[in-house]
Amino acid sequence: YTMNADNSFISYINSLHCLDGNSDGALAEMQATSPYFTGIQVVHPWVKVLEEKLLNGKEHVILTGRAGDGKSTLALSLYKKLKGIDSEKPLDCGLNKKEEVPYEKKRIILIKDLSEWTVEEQDQLLEQMTYGHDRYLLVSNTGTLLDMFRRNATDKVAMESNLLTAISSSESQSQEFQLRGDKTVKVCVHNLGLRNNSDVALKLWDNMVATMEWNKCETCSIAVSYTHLRAHETLMN
């Protein structure tokens, strides 16, 4: 798309792709505070699933997958739901690397990106998860996750094998891991990278096309040259 000085929505849309270095709009930190994002977003179906597990389950939840597959965005939606914040309302700032939400007599603790934590902090975090009272959501790429569990395992080979099995499944997998110091931690692993997210993508596309922000382009002299703008005008009429 061509930059339009009169429509900042165009600039926002241009920040979502990776054709050039300006892809800041795809970052979860930017999505948290952007009114444009809240206007087109699609709340992922897993938000409800993970909320139920954290509130009523007996395990911690691990959300893993590939870089850029939307894990942090999903965590943002879950945070809003747990806090009772309207999903269409932007936050004043992005999520901290650790967010705590009180629930009954426990806390729901969201770790939005495990790679932001030092090795020492990760090990302390895993130890805290063994206490069993609070519920944790860990968002992490697979490499960082494997490294943390291997460091703290009594049997590194068995730990890696079991965790890789859980990560490689398209269905959520519950595991209990034995850690050093005769401690155990129970987790349920969800791999977002193995889910077919085309349903979310199609809904997002519909929202991007239907938003009234495109109406500002009607006064642009070159708008008629762009097929998607003509299609949007036809759709709206």
Describe the role of every protein-language-model region:
Residues 22-49:
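N-terminal pre-Walker A segment at the start of P-loop NTPase domains
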Residues 52-58:
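Phosphate-binding P-loop
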Residues 60-73:
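Walker A/P-loop nucleotide-binding motif
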Residues 81-89:
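Post-Walker A helix-loop "phosphate-sensing" segment adjacent to the P-loop in P-loop NTPases
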Residues 101-137:
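Conserved nucleotide-sensing/catalytic segment adjacent to the nucleotide-binding pocket
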Residues 113-114, 140-144, 173, 193-195:
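A short beta-strand-to-loop transition that corresponds to the Sensor-1 phosphate-sensing loop
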Residues 176-186, 190-220:
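Conserved small helical "lid"/interfacial subdomain of P-loop NTPases
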Residues 227-234:
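Conserved small/polar residues in nucleotide/adenosyl-binding loops
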